[in-house]
Amino acid sequence: MKNRINNSGDKLRAVEIAITEIVNGTEESTAGGIRPDLEPYGGTGDVTFIWGDKKKGLYHIGYRRGPDVVGNVIKAVIRGEIIRNSDVKKTVTLSDNGYEAVLSLDLHGTNQTWLLTGWKENAPDADGEVSTQSDATQTEPTFSRSDLGAGTSKILSELAREVNNNT
């Protein structure tokens, strides 16, 4: 049996370490033992985050919605309530404050971990507006590891304050 983390502060620290590793250039990082409540669905309590690209991972979420949404999806991973699961697809959906995180069971030999593979923001799509006197220099939005770091540190700091206020 892997390490289980039941304390909110310890869960937060494990996720901060994983996200910091990704911001610093690692392609994927696992926050071990943060969701022991997922074990009955076939995996461990480990959740793996991947940087990804335009089609998957944290980059995909940030590229589509920005760093604040990435932070809120990560918050759903940390403290979200299980709202549904699919035995066929081997997925579990967690919900927190209007954000959903979809975790898929990922098998690496005998290692079973949950991989953040989807998300949902319960808000309609909206086009961004820009007020500038010059033409855009990029044809599409950009998102970087430093954007991830700035956005998620803000969200994780807010969550840390909540945890500290409740202890």
Where are the model-predicted features located?
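Ribonuclease/tRNase effector modules and their secretory precursors
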Residues: 1-167
